[in-house]
Amino acid sequence: MTTKDLVAALTAGRIVYDNGAEQVFDHSGATTYVDRGHAVHGEWYVDDDGRFALFWPPSYRAPYDLQWIVEDGSIVGLRFSHREHGSQFSARYA
C-alpha cells in the first residue's frame, strides 16, 4: 500500500474491530480508540520507510502493515499485521 493509500485508508471514516471496539484516524495524525466506552487518545503516522505506526502515550509505539479487506470488488475494511509480533486483527468501515 502506498503512503497515499495508507492515509486514504485510515482517514476514510470510523472503523469497527472484530471485538466491537472503534477507532477514528484524523488527517492531523490524531487517533481515538474506544472500547466499551473507554476512549484512548494517541497518534498515527507514516514512518520514513512509508509504513504505518501508532503511538500511544506515554511511550508505546506499534508498527503495522496494512492490507485492504475486499468483498465483491469493494473495499470494506482493513487488516492490520503487527510488524514485530506478527499478530493480526481486522476492522471494517462503519
Language-model regions: role of each:
Residues M1-A94:
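Lipid interaction determinants
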